[in-house]
Regions:
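Active-site recognition of the HExxH zinc-binding catalytic motif
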Residues: 104-117
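Post-HExxH zinc-binding segment in Zn-dependent metallohydrolases
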Residues: 125-159
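Short, low-complexity, Pro/Ser/Thr/Gly-rich segments in the mature regions of secreted, periplasmic
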Residues: 157-175
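A metal-dependent hydrolase signature that marks the N-terminal structural subdomain at the beginning
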Residues: 15-72
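Bacterial N-terminal signal peptides
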Residues: 5-14
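Soluble non-cytosolic domains of exported or imported proteins
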Residues: 22-26, 96-105, 124-132
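Substrate-binding clefts and substrate-entry loops adjacent to catalytic sites
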Residues: 89-96, 114-125
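Active-site scaffold of zinc-dependent metalloenzymes
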Residues: 65-99
Length: 175
C-alpha cells in the first residue's frame, strides 16, 4: 500500500526533469543529439542543464550585472556554464516572434552547452565567435522544424554580434 502511494506521488516528479520537458515534442536529450548530428561538436554525457524561465529584466540583470536597467535590453536567454543553467525570457523579446519562441531560444542555448563541454570555449578566439554556430544551428532548426521564418536571425545582426573586438576576450556567459 505504501509502495503504491509513493509511486503515485512520485511518478509525476519524473516528468519535471529538463530532459522530459516538452518543447513541442522535443526533449533536451533529442535536441542535444540534433546539435551533435548537425555540427562538429560532440556530447560527452555531461549532465543536462537546468532550464528556467525568467523575466526579461532578470535575464538582462544577469548578463549586465553592473549596468543600469534599461528597456531596450532584448536578450532572449543565456547559458551559464558555471551553474550549468539555461535561462529563457518568459515573454517573447522584441526581435523574435511567438512561434516556438522558447524552443528556438533553447536550441541556441543548448549549442552553447554542447560547445562548453566539448572544449570550444577554450578554442574560440573570443566569446562572440561562439555565437556563429549557435545562430547558424538555430536558423537550421527553424527551417527543419517548419517554424515561422520570421524567427530566423537577421544576417546583418549576426555579422555584427559575432565579430571579435581585438581577437581576445573573456569567455563568460553566452547568450
Amino acid at each position: 500500500m505504501l509502495r503504491t502511494l509513493l509511486i503515485i506521488l512520485l511518478l509525476p516528479l519524473a516528468f519535471c526533469h529538463p530532459v522530459n520537458a516538452d518543447h513541442k515534442g522535443h526533449t533536451v536529450e533529442s535536441m542535444v543529439q540534433w546539435i551533435v548530428d548537425n555540427s562538429r561538436y560532440e556530447y560527452h554525457g555531461d549532465p543536462y542543464p537546468n532550464i528556467v524561465l525568467e523575466s526579461p529584466q532578470q535575464v538582462c540583470e544577469t548578463i549586465y550585472p553592473n549596468a543600469e536597467p534599461h528597456a531596450d535590453c532584448n536578450i532572449a536567454g543565456y547559458y551559464d556554464h558555471e551553474q550549468n543553467r539555461i535561462a529563457i525570457a518568459d515573454v517573447v523579446t522584441e526581435y523574435m516572434v511567438e512561434d516556438h519562441f522558447t524552443e528556438v531560444v533553447l536550441i541556441h542555448e543548448l549549442v552553447h552547452f554542447v560547445q562548453y563541454h566539448d572544449g570550444e570555449y577554450e578554442r574560440a578566439k573570443c566569446m562572440p565567435e561562439l555565437e556563429i554556430d549557435a545562430f547558424g544551428l538555430q536558423d537550421q532548426w527553424i527551417d527543419e522544424q517548419g517554424i515561422d521564418p520570421e524567427q530566423k536571425n537577421d544576417p546583418l545582426f549576426v555579422v555584427f554580434v559575432t565579430m571579435c573586438q581585438d581577437g581576445h576576450g573573456p569567455i563568460g556567459n553566452t547568450h
